[in-house]
Amino acid sequence: MLFTAFEDGGPMWTRSGPRVERCAVRFPTPFLGVPAVHVGLSMWDIAMDSNQRVDVSADEITPQGFVILFRTWGDTRVARARVSWMAIGPTEHEDDFLLD
């Protein structure tokens, strides 16, 4: 779960205007270079009494990890959201042949 704002009255549920949630992700195995990262909503629970405005993206991508950004604005109220991600890039492997 990226966040849940309904139970504790968090800003995504109780406020309006521009809001952002940030969630740091650390890769289990670091990549050899900066990977390509894809993020997408896998669940959202949003109030139906206003427009549903959401922007989800990957930021600060490094070989060690990245930050998920979940943004909304206006009068959109978000109770909770889950984001899935996939990172693609080269990693070390025990069969790699490295020259000195």
Predicted feature descriptions by range:
Residues M1-D100:
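Extracellular attachment/recognition segments
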